[in-house]
């Protein structure tokens, strides 16, 4: 019985600790997340989910065009 209670308390403590440390240090992080999502709904072409990247072997100008992030005249 004592062991079960100790395990439950430990799990609750670790869960609370995870939530506290996982939150960004900005006090308005949720507001910024909401505004970004709202902007992406209004401007779907600007959404990061819609960005296209080139597969390996395709010609490129910079690494940010390639899915792998590596560009030496062609995507690697």
UniProtKB/Swiss-Prot annotation:
Keywords recorded for this protein, A-Z: Cleavage on pair of basic residues, Disulfide bond, Ion channel impairing toxin, Knottin, Neurotoxin, Secreted, Signal, Toxin
Family affiliation: Belongs to the conotoxin O1 superfamily.
Database matches in InterPro entries: Conotoxin
GO MF terms held by the record: ion channel inhibitor activity; toxin activity
Protein's UniProt name: Conotoxin Vc6.6
Domain comment (free text): The presence of a 'disulfide through disulfide knot' structurally defines this protein as a knottin.
Predominant place of localization: secreted
Tissue-wise expression: Expressed by the venom duct.
Signal sequence segment: 1-22
Residue ranges of the TM segments: none
Chain residues in the propeptide: 23-52
């Amino acid at each position: 019985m004592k062991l079960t209670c100790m395990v439950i308390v430990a799990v609750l403590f670790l869960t609370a600790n995870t939530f506290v440390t996982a939150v960004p240090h900005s006090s308005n992080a949720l507001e910024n997340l909401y505004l970004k999502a709202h902007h992406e709904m209004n401007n779907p072409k600007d959404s990061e989910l819609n960005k296209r990247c080139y597969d390996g072997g395709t010609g490129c100008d910079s690494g940010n065009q390639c899915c792998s992030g590596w560009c030496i005249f062609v995507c690697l």
